[in-house]
């Protein structure tokens, strides 16, 4: 989302031209370049692409498994899982179409894929990130609705509705991302020789700040606040009895234990979902906001390192989503075991043995109690 602009591979001074978005890196064009003088090769030139490759591997495998499990098992085709599949699809598109191009920016001195790919990759990156944020918000609203209004949700919360909402999410994401097509372009720069850079070029600083502020609100602040609000309502609602319990101490105690257990599980899920999204996307969003609005901001190698780390954090979110939204759910775990039983043979065998041992112990205790009762009689 922000990686194609101002990715500096030099610790030397950055010269700002024009509106502040066009830049030259390294030596001036007038500087005499000695024979054999080449641009420096930093550790991040290979370390960052290696990290991105790991993200792609984990993310593609995890998200593909999520979609495969949902499509293979009929009982998994629920409204919530439809949103999860949509989220996995956005992550796959992001990982395949955006991450490889971003990874090349670190070992290469500039953009080499032309103006069309500059616009296309940046636009698709913005679309997928926007769709991810809106999908997360829709998932939170869906879970909140089914928790707070369980009876009403039986009529309105269907896979068909989830499909319609998902289509609207994609359409809205395409529309909201159109400014990228207008402002993303190839710009000339100089870094140990003339280079080309794929970056956003706005008519004025006001346009640039307005777009960055929109990105911060629509793609970070609003989803985080909405998710937090929805799950706060869920924590308050989950565990409350829908019917009055009978006057039975055992039932009251059992209900209390279930309430505490469910409330604890939902609270943990809230912490994971909100913190994961906030931690992964927060640094890059705040950095770009600071970069645009802070008047004394100075681009240098230190800020480049911070931005590189922030980009890695945001990209990693696409690989960890399946762990949180998929494999932490009991239904996904069961379906995954059914789909790949050969991976869980040892665990299933141990579970069966433990079950048989427990049954034998229960029968032994029951027999002992029966013998004791006969002796008393």
From Swiss-Prot:
Keyword check for Ligase: no
Annotated transmembrane regions: 50-70, 92-112, 120-140, 161-181, 210-230, 270-290, 306-328
Compartments (UniProt record): Cell membrane
Superkingdom of source: Eukaryota
CDD domains found in the cross-reference section: 7tmA_KiSS1R (cd15095)
Membrane topology, Cytoplasmic segments: 71-91, 141-160, 231-269, 329-377
Glycosylation sites per record: 9, 17, 22
Pfam families per the UniProt record, alphabetical: 7tm_1
Keywords from the UniProt entry: Cell membrane, Disulfide bond, G-protein coupled receptor, Glycoprotein, Membrane, Receptor, Transducer, Transmembrane, Transmembrane helix
Disulfide links within the chain: 118-198
Gene3D superfamilies, alphabetized: Rhodopsin 7-helix transmembrane proteins (1.20.1070.10)
Membrane topology: Multi-pass membrane protein
InterPro entries: GPCR_Rhodpsn, GPCR_Rhodpsn_7TM, KiSS_1_rcpt
Membrane topology, Extracellular segments: 1-49, 113-119, 182-209, 291-305
Family matches, as PANTHER family: GALANIN-LIKE G-PROTEIN COUPLED RECEPTOR NPR-9 (PTHR45695:SF23), LEUCOKININ RECEPTOR-RELATED (PTHR45695)
Free-text function comment from the UniProt entry: Receptor speculated to be essential for sexual development. May regulate gonadotropin-releasing hormone (GnRH) secretion. The receptor expression could be a 'stop signal' for GnRH1, GnRH2, and GnRH3 neuronal migration, leading to suppression of cell growth and modulation of GnRH secretion, which is important for normal sexual development.
Record-given protein name: G-protein coupled receptor 54
Gene source species: Oreochromis niloticus
Annotated gene: gpr54
